[in-house]
Amino acid sequence: MSKQDAIEIEGTVTESLPNAMFRVDLDNGFNVLAHISGKIRRNYIKILPGDRVKVELTPYDLTKGRITYRLRKK
């Protein structure tokens, strides 16, 4: 799967799970299980419940994703 095939959508973190996994409610109403990307892990960016994030989904499995960006608070 190439990067162009990935679906990128915004959502809100609702639950923090073990092993850097998170439950995310997407803006379209779906709920996905997401892990954090390597750059977020390497730069020690903290993700807490209530944070707005960008999630990358594959077209093959729309129930799992990767958190690629934490959006700034307004």
UniProtKB/Swiss-Prot annotation:
Places the protein is found: Cytoplasm
Classification via CDD domains: S1_IF1
A Pfam family matched in the record: eIF-1a
Single GO term (MF): rRNA binding
Family matches, as InterPro entries: NA-bd_OB-fold (IPR012340), RNA-binding_domain_S1_IF1 (IPR006196), S1_domain (IPR003029), TIF_IF1 (IPR004368)
Keyword RNA-binding: yes
Domain S1-like positions: 1-72
Keywords annotated in UniProt: Cytoplasm, Initiation factor, Protein biosynthesis, RNA-binding, rRNA-binding
GO cellular component, as recorded: cytosol
Described function: One of the essential components for the initiation of protein synthesis. Stabilizes the binding of IF-2 and IF-3 on the 30S subunit to which N-formylmethionyl-tRNA(fMet) subsequently binds. Helps modulate mRNA selection, yielding the 30S pre-initiation complex (PIC). Upon addition of the 50S ribosomal subunit IF-1, IF-2 and IF-3 are released leaving the mature 70S translation initiation complex.
Subunit field text: Component of the 30S ribosomal translation pre-initiation complex which assembles on the 30S ribosome in the order IF-2 and IF-3, IF-1 and N-formylmethionyl-tRNA(fMet); mRNA recruitment can occur at any time during PIC assembly.
Family: Belongs to the IF-1 family.
Protein name as annotated: Translation initiation factor IF-1
Source organism: Thermosynechococcus vestitus (strain NIES-2133 / IAM M-273 / BP-1)
